[in-house]
Regions:
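Peripheral, non-catalytic regulatory segments
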Residues: 1-92
Length: 92
C-alpha cells in the first residue's frame, strides 16, 4: 500500500517495531522477511514495522501519497512514510 493512515493501535497485526538508524524500504523488508513476517511497513523515517497481516483483516484507510514523503534515516533518496503514515509492503 503506497501510503496508509496508521493509528495508536497500529494497522499491522502482531506488529513488532524496530528503530533503524539506517532505515530504508529495503532494510525494513529484509528485516521482516528474515523474521518470517508477511508484511513490512516504514513510518516516520526510522521506524520499521513487521506484521502478520492487517488488524482484524481490514486494510487501513489510504492517505495522500504526499503524506508519505518523510526521508528515510538510511537513504536520502528513499521515502519512509510520515507522521502516522505508513508505507506497507506485502511479501508474496
Amino acid at each position: 500500500m503506497p501510503c496508509a493512515i496508521d493509528n495508536p493501535q497500529r494497522v499491522l497485526a502482531n506488529a513488532i517495531v524496530s528503530y533503524l538508524p539506517g532505515n530504508t524500504p529495503y532494510a525494513c523488508t529484509t528485516l521482516c522477511a528474515g523474521k518470517d513476517y508477511a508484511y513490512a511497513g516504514v513510518e516516520y523515517g526510522d521506524e520499521c514495522y513487521c506484521g502478520t497481516g492487517y488488524v482484524d483483516g481490514v486494510m487501513p484507510p489510504a492517505a495522500e501519497l504526499s503524506d508519505c514523503s518523510m526521508l528515510c534515516s538510511g537513504g536520502y533518496y528513499y521515502y519512509c512514510g510520515g507522521s502516522w503514515r505508513m508505507q506497507i509492503y506485502k511479501f508474496t
